[in-house]
Amino acid sequence: LLEECVILTVGGTEIDISALVDTINLYEDIFSMTVSGDIIIKDTNNLVLNAPIIGEEKLKLKIQTPQTSPKTHNETDTSIVDYVVTPLQVYKINKVMGSGESALIYSLQFTTQEAFRNQISRVSQSYKGDPADIVEKIMRDKNYLDSTRKLFVEPTANMVKMIVPNKKPFNAIQHLCEISNSKQNGEAPSYLFYETTKGFHFRSIDGLCTQDVSMAYKEHIPNSTDEKGMINAKINLENIEEVSVKASKDTIYNMSEGFYSSKLRVHDLYNKSLKDYDYHYLNEFSKDTHTDGASPVISKSSDARTQKTLADYPDTKLFVSTTSSTKLFSEGTEYPYQSDNLDKTLQRRRSRLKQ
């Protein structure tokens, strides 16, 4: 149900295009930092020339999606997609095609305003404290993303002290994802930053695996109707439109990427010493949170000749890093910060994301 669809032109004019909308697509991805989408318009007023639409407009959009159980129609209803207070940003006009004598069909691609602000701002300052708090500071800072959207955070277990050297805001947040450990899920280092229609999320893959099922998808006949001949929107929403089979496992590639095992060699500049950290996929598997029934993707049985599993070869992937002793610093009785935290994040995170 389309409740509101209004274009705000660069000149400040509001144009209601609800009656012209043919299709609206919204895309969410836990590996994408912002929501994106497109809207297909059947235009009888030639808005591209008359408004004009130039790819810099704002889009107010409010949609109500089908629900599993009835709810009160209010602002907190999870079935409502609301971009009225925080309009979307139109950034591209796709090919304009004629339809009949007086209509044009074209699509407008859009994303959230945070994606636009990320392109025009850079972070150059130092931060210290909880990574989750630093993410929120970057999100709310008027010089950076200046976001008013909700931010859902999974608490982090470590403290960091970092300098962001002229990076785009999302790049700074991505770095925080790479050095953070979860406080709730076995210090999992699998943090992601992404956006849904409900807000932004800074949480680990392990935390996502603990969530309840939100919707069960089934295969239905597309655009099926009920007894009254009406299209059942809820069934169409739950319908599986396409199924594809992922490529078969590539063992050599996975070994070279550090999926099964790896070695991190750390050079301590202060003590002039080297220390190795070996990652073993089979030994670490139980520390991660998995979906129901998950089991290791490699055999636990040792090779008959070498008496080793694929996880017993840490030299297949080598990482090198430098560090310095905390004795160089003084802050109270204990130095609580970690510069990069790589020994607790890099290898386990690398393997987790490959899974």
Q: Predicted regions span which residues?
A:
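Short, intrinsically disordered, mixed-charge
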Residues: 55, 140, 178-182
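Assembly/oligomerization scaffold segments
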Residues: 1-120
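Second-shell loop/turn segments in exported
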Residues: 48, 119-128, 158-164
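Short beta-strand-centered interaction patches in the first periplasmic/extracellular domains
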Residues: 105-108, 114, 151-252, 256-258
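An acidic/polar, Gly/Ser/Thr-rich interaction patch typically located in mid-to-C-terminal regions
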Residues: 25-52, 223-355
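Short secondary-structure capping/junction motifs at helix and strand boundaries
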Residues: 70-72, 80-82, 145-150, 185-190
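Glycine-rich, acidic and aromatic/proline-enriched surface loops and short helix-turn segments
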Residues: 101-117, 128-151
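Glycine-centered loop/turn motifs
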Residues: 54-62, 217-218, 225, 355
